[in-house]
Design a protein with these regions (language model features):
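Carbohydrate-active catalytic/glycan-binding domains of CAZyme proteins
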Residues: 1-548
Length: 548
């Protein structure tokens, strides 16, 4: 059986495609760089982090964008006629006054690892844009056209516009073609496909919260009209009817289903195997209950599907409830490399599993300056939306132990470095070494930001020598705490126990759609040049344990 989620941690809005025997899956990254991870599989069960699409933080400038803005809902497709991969993605610039100012772009590559073409601007009519490669060679871009006018149904409807690959521009204005297949409202995430005589439109409805779902419609004409699937929704965490068209809230916690491990299931994309089997990937979450807080963010899950005799897509078991265990395909099992638990930084390149907010990690993290270490150059404070030195990886379990060994000699109080548990620039816990002017020497202490409110735990600070120091973060379900050591054997706890559940979309006021990260960090708020050397980064997580 395939165990869900297939890609745990902050990996939302999955879009899947196949080229030959290889399956590729793209997810959203929002303010994090590198952007748009591509996961690879041979059997739909085992997945590896393969590459990233966006690696130039000058070409795609995310600096100064608030949390949860940036790269939204990439659409990854493979056009067999052209032997070409397409990625359509949006850069969300602002959600102020619910205007959702977004710019949508298209890029292509012959190889999934690139190089990718220069971005082609499509439009700014709405978000979650995707592309259809029609049988006749024409192409169409669909997206949610966000509604801002008073007196009109929110949040809007699915619109479509033709795209000219020759001219590299869309033709005319987008036209509305679909307003949903259920009464759940909050339609988004359209994917348009062609199978046989039908065009199928797959969407998410209900908001990307507890009433989330996958719906479908179909038409024999690309411009419609589209008929609703009589079973809608076809995949969800909360089966049953609901009418929420007038409710703009995306979270809708009243629809939490205590009978399901997987919550928020929706935003789907399907693929057919070489043997004709059908699988659908979708986002999902596993909240702490009863708090209903999803510390791991929105994750990627998969469901086995089938086509009915009357050409509708259904879950293989005939239900529409997302399952945590899914039948495997007939493809031969193919284990793939996993991200290593221990990184001793002996490689000449930084691992592709590291991310940084708004800038590329390589702009401040150097594995060549001192072989066997990563040197992190300090920049702005960790609350900044500009240039912040946080070298992070995704938290994939709420049962984890993260350890590092650091060499750092702060010279002024604006210098600090250490280990961090991070949701966004307004929510983090940082065990830091810094220069204490009061003590006249280096010290370690914890600094905590909770929805923008800063607390420095000076009562538990400890003076330390300027020698190598070990730092460790424990995450045990709802409880998280830090420890430190001189020798890496005898650790002592520092500070209090923190509430892991608060690192979540539901609790954090300044972000909505990402997930929790753990990592190494350094700040130099004077000259942006003082650095810390880290000998290793060890991440041990038990991904088999349930969230609760």
């Amino acid at each position: 059986m395939i165990q869900n989620p297939i890609i745990p941690g902050f990996n939302p809005d999955p879009c899947i495609c196949r080229k030959g025997d290889d399956y590729y899956l793209a997810v959203s990254t929002f303010e994090w760089f590198p952007g748009i991870p591509i996961y690879h599989s041979k059997d739909l069960k085992n997945w590896e982090l393969y590459t990233h699409v966006l690696t130039d933080d000058e070409k795609v400038d995310l600096k100064k964008l608030p949390s949860a803005k940036g790269i939204w809902a990439p659409c990854l497709t493979y056009c067999e006629k052209e032997d070409l991969f397409y990625v359509v993605y949006g850069v969300m610039n602002s959600m102020n006054a619910r205007y959702f100012d977004v710019d949508n772009f298209l890029i292509t590559a012959k190889d999934i690892k690139g190089p990718w073409s220069e971005p082609v601007y499509l439009h700014s009519a709405g978000f979650d844009a995707s592309i259809l490669h029609d049988d006749d060679g024409r192409k169409y871009v669909v997206s949610l056209e966000w509604e801002t006018r008073e007196g009109y149904e929110k949040p809007g409807a699915i619109c479509m516009v033709e795209y000219s690959a020759e001219k590299k521009e869309v033709i005319g204005y987008p036209k509305r073609i679909w307003n949903g297949g259920t009464g759940r409202g909050c339609i988004e995430a359209p994917h348009l496909t062609k199978r046989g005589e039908y065009y199928y439109i797959m969407c998410a409805e209900g908001g990307t919260g507890y009433n989330h779902c996958v719906t479908m419609g179909r038409s024999k004409e690309v411009w419609g009209p589209y008929e609703k699937d009589p079973m809608n929704p076809i995949v969800t965490s909360v089966p049953g009817y609901s009418n929420e068209r007038q409710d703009p809230d995306h979270l809708k916690p009243k629809y939490y289903n205590p009978e399901s491990v997987l919550q928020k299931s929706g935003h789907g994309s399907y693929v057919e195997t070489q043997d004709g089997e059908v699988y659908l990937v979708h986002l999902t979450s596993r909240p702490f209950a009863p708090e209903l807080r999803c510390t791991l963010g929105r994750e990627t899950a998969i469901q086995k599907m089938k086509w009915t005799e009357d050409n509708w897509l259904r879950m293989a078991d005939g239900s529409n409830l997302a399952k945590i265990e899914v039948p495997e395909s007939s493809l031969p099992e193919c284990p793939l490399p996993k991200v290593p638990d221990m990184d001793d930084f002996d490689s000449e390149e930084l691992g592709n599993w590291y991310y940084a907010p708004r800038i590329m990690p390589q702009s401040f993290a150097d594995v060549k300056a001192r072989p066997g270490y990563v040197r992190i150059r300090g920049q702005e404070s960790r609350t900044s939306l500009n240039k912040v030195s946080i070298l992070a990886r995704k938290l994939t379990s709420v049962y984890a132990r993260i350890t590092t060994k650091m060499e750092f000699k702060p010279e002024v109080h604006q210098h600090s470095a250490g280990l961090i548990l991070y949701y966004d620039n307004m929510n983090y816990i940082n065990l830091r070494k810094y220069y204490s002017q009061t003590l006249g020497q280096s010290a370690i202490s914890i600094i905590h930001l909770e929805n923008g409110v800063k607390t420095e735990f000076l009562n538990t600070r400890i003076p330390v020598d300027d020698c190598p120091i070990y730092m460790r973060l424990y995450i045990e379900g709802r409880k998280s705490w830090f420890e430190w050591s001189y020798d890496g054997v005898n650790y002592q706890k520092i500070g209090r126990i923190f509430d892991t559940t608060k690192f979540s979309d539901e609790y954090c006021k300044y972000g909505e759609f990402t997930g929790t990260m753990v990592g190494l960090t350094c700040a130099d708020r004077v000259y942006h040049r003082h650095y810390a050397d880290f000998d290793f980064f060890e991440y041990q997580a038990d991904e088999t344990k349930p969230v609760n």
